[in-house]
UniProtKB/Swiss-Prot annotation:
Gene Ontology terms: cellular component: extracellular region; lysosome
Entry similarity comment: Belongs to the ependymin family.
Keywords: Calcium, Disulfide bond, Glycoprotein, Secreted, Signal
Gene designation: epd2
The protein's name in its UniProt record: Ependymin-2
Post-translational modification: Different glycosylation variants are known as EPD-beta and EPD-gamma. Binds calcium through the terminal sialic acids.
Any one GO molecular function term: calcium ion binding
Predominant localisation class: secreted
Oligomeric form and interacting partners: Forms disulfide-linked dimers.
Expression by tissue: EPDs are synthesized in the meninx and secreted in the cerebrospinal fluid.
Pfam families found in the cross-reference section: Ependymin
Function: May play a role in neural plasticity. May be involved during axon regeneration.
Amino acid sequence: MHTVKLLCVVFSCLCAVAWASSDRQPCHSPPLISGTMKVVSTGGHDLASGEFSYDSKANKFRFVEDAAHANKTSHTDVLVHFEEGTLYEIDSKNESCKKETLQFRKHLMEIPPDATHESEIYMGSPSITEQGLRVRVWSGKLPELHAHYSLSITSCGCLPVSGSYYGDKKDLLFSFFGVETEVDDLQVFVPPAYCEGVAFEEAPDDHSFFDLFHD
């Protein structure tokens, strides 16, 4: 118990130092994170809700929508290899796969290096133990998509909290819950065997991560 308390004190001190001395450079996500992600439109429509996994070193992302979400007849299951520019839309029920090229590779799981630091705020209470969360807010433009974004991440740990995307075609709000610094099964980043040999489908140059979420 004393060890746990000591570790908590040390962690709090390190966070305080980071708060005081940070030069506000974009941080990097932990090597592996997972949790729940919810996406809604600014009009209040639920677009997707499910489990995500992200490998920051390999820049790979998996999102599996809750099958019961929004009474949909089908649900989203996507695997994105951002470095390779490949997007897989997976239908495990029918063992089918759609493969597309992804020319635009920015996303909201990482802070882009050209992002602007907007503010550092406390969500909840800064004075009551375990009743607040310190976050940093970053923003930037995505000129290729005629869009801009904002991203809130924890000041200590660089974990995603929320994000927004505002473009000509759509506006999206992202929320992240129960984020852990681990992924239970690394096979989630490997395309199923039935995706092998599938030909790439043509996609527009501005095809992006944000196109995955729509009414």
